[in-house]
Amino acid sequence: MYGLINIGFGNVISGDRVIAIVNPESAPLKRLKDEAKDEGKLIDATYGRKTRAILITDSNHIILSAIQPETIAQRFKQSMIEIEENLNKVR
């Protein structure tokens, strides 16, 4: 239960759908990106900037972000903390 996560430049994704945040430099991930593009499952949220993170979703969509994977992971963590705090207020 993560809510919406900002992945840069006003783009947000459903945190619950993301299964991995990875660095795009390896050859297998470059192939994965190319395959997703061919299948119409590539979402480019970089606004023309260098891809610094690849997010893989449970629907096999590949999302490109210009934000570092560590930064996105920190945003996931912060989102989880905020949701936990809000749930504790309700309880």
From Swiss-Prot:
Species assigned in the record: Pseudothermotoga lettingae (strain ATCC BAA-301 / DSM 14385 / NBRC 107922 / TMO)
Q: Which family does it belong to?
A: Belongs to the RemA family.
Here the disulfide bonds are: none
InterPro entries linked: RemA-like
Pfam families (UniProt xref): RemA-like
UniProt-recorded name of the protein: Putative regulatory protein Tlet_1629
